[in-house]
């Protein structure tokens, strides 16, 4: 089987990691080789002091793109869970990787604030951090993702099934 990349984009707390884990489980149960490339995990493991400037985010995204490209080229389904706030970098990922599907993981701001798994929204509301993507920082919503899921209205299972159906429609899965 040829590999491909499922690129999960969306603001913090939208449900990207939850969907990535659910998708990986379902795809592995179907017999596929799958790797999750989680933006937070990669950042903490490889370069914890990188920072969050636009340049640092772009460098981080380019590294993840390269990793996904290598996995895809070697017959693995790469599931990328990464905010990737800039349209231009997501377009670059699509061009570089080739076999690629963009999944916009959406949840309304009030839902993300309630979830707040990393405590980032609480810090932003208190004024302790600035530029939080999807709060007071830039997030350029995808215009034509292959799939859009609203994690406030769908279960992770429903989201994963929708993504798998689309991957089949695109010919990435039989």
Swiss-Prot record:
Q: Which UniProt keywords apply?
A: ATP-binding, Kinase, Nucleotide-binding, Phosphoprotein, Transferase
GO biological process, alphabetically ordered: hydrogen sulfide biosynthetic process; sulfate assimilation via adenylyl sulfate reduction; sulfate assimilation, phosphoadenylyl sulfate reduction by phosphoadenylyl-sulfate reductase (thioredoxin)
Pfam families noted in UniProt: APS_kinase
Q: Which residues bind ATP?
A: 10-17
- On the tree of life, the source organism's domain of life is Archaea
Gene3D superfamilies registered for this protein in UniProt? P-loop containing nucleotide triphosphate hydrolases
Carries keyword Ligase?
A: no
Per the record, its GO cellular-component terms are: cytoplasm
Provide any one GO MF term from the record: adenylylsulfate kinase activity
Cited function: Catalyzes the synthesis of activated sulfate.
The record's similarity note reads: Belongs to the APS kinase family.
The identity of this protein, by name, is: Probable adenylyl-sulfate kinase
The organism named in the record is Pyrococcus abyssi (strain GE5 / Orsay)
């Amino acid at each position: 089987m040829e590999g491909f990349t499922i690129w999960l984009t969306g603001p913090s707390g939208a449900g990207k990691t939850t969907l990535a884990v659910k998708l990986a489980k379902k795809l592995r149960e179907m017999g596929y080789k799958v790797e999750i490339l989680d933006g937070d995990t990669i950042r903490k493991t490889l370069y914890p002091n990188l920072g969050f400037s636009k340049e640092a985010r772009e460098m981080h995204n380019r590294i993840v793109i390269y990793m996904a490209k290598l996995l895809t080229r070697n017959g693995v389904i790469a599931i990328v869970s990464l905010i990737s706030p800039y349209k231009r970098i997501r377009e670059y990922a699509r061009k570089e990787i080739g076999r690629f599907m963009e999944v916009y993981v959406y949840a309304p701001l009030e839902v993300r604030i309630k979830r707040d798994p990393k405590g980032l929204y609480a810090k932003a509301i208190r004024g302790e951090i600035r530029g939080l993507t999807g709060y007071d920082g830039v997030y350029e919503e995808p215009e034509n993702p292959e799939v859009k899921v609203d994690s406030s209205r769908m279960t992770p299972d429903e989201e994963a099934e929708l993504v798998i159906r689309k991957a089949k429609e695109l010919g990435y899965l039989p």
